Amino acid sequence: MTTTLNRPTAAAPAATKTKPTFRQRLNVFDVKASPYLYIAPFFILFAVVGLFPLGYTFFVSLFDWHLLKGQGEFVGLRNFTEVLQDRFFWNSLLNTMSIFLLSSIPQLAVAIVVAAVLDQNLRAKTFWRMSILLPYVVTPVAVAMIFTNMFGEQYGLINNILGSFGIDPILWKNETLPSHIAIATMVNWRWTGYNALILLAAMQAVPRDIYESAAIDGAGPFRRFFSITLPSIRPTMVFVIVTATIGGLQIFTEPRLFDPVAAGGTQRQFQTTVLYLWEMAFQRQNFGKASTIAWLLFLIIVLFGLVNYLITRRIATTADGRRRGRTRGRRTGSTTGGESRHHRARQRRNDAVDPASGTPAETVPSTAGTTPRSGL
């Protein structure tokens, strides 16, 4: 009897880890660091023209800062307390909200309609798209001069037209609501075409086969618009709403030029928050309170942005849930319908079998109407 012994194999030598070369290290650094280097100029520029002025404005708001005398004593949050107790600040904020609502809501509605019309197969499409952008190209000063003459109380075009119908002239500059409507009209005329082009670009990105499928299924133009177009451009609508909110809360040029003599009106009936900030800084020369108003306006804009984000997120979540529910319902309906069809087919097969003989009914001879034969 022989016994064979296997010799233990020698352990494999440990793999030596090669040291990466300088070129390899440079390639790894390029892959990891190059994305940050590409976006670094934006953040550097944002820090210089955005974060630094924001922080410096907050620093100024903590002092009794005069335009000519410069930095005064440290007052802490006293400027915030005094501004929040100032009735002129709340009046300007109320005027800003009123003009914002009168301008943003009609502006978005008209922009959607104009974009939907331009999305059709029109002749000279480029001409019409360029035409609606002309009000945005015109300088705000020219727009303010035109609309100031139109809304003139004595010789304005609007009051002359109303007078031809026997309507008394409206005091566009001395009453609160008419002045807000006039300023909102200026804003709408200037920004509606710009927003319409943004919405038009979103509408053109919607696949056309979806509209064709909906038309084949019998959906009309309005049904396709509300069921396909509006849900598809929801992200763009959110962008337009956010930008309109920021611009509406920072409105300055239109109310400033609407009545150049009395900025904001004789009774501050259309003085906005930014216009009140300008008055506090350059007429009262109180940079501390002006910086405080700027910071409060910044916080209000951030609050409005968060509210818009939460509302749009809620709408998107609800729409996705409804879409999944409809899809699940169609799947369940198709499964149930298939089971029902199988059940009906099985029932027909059972009914087609003669219960006495077990043979199919079509093979059983019919004896109806015959008399049995006798054995004779």
Predicted regions mapped to residue ranges:
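A structural signal for multi-pass alpha-helical bundles of membrane permease subunits
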Residues: 31-323
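Transmembrane alpha-helical segments of polytopic membrane transport and secretion proteins
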Residues: 1-38, 123-125, 309-376
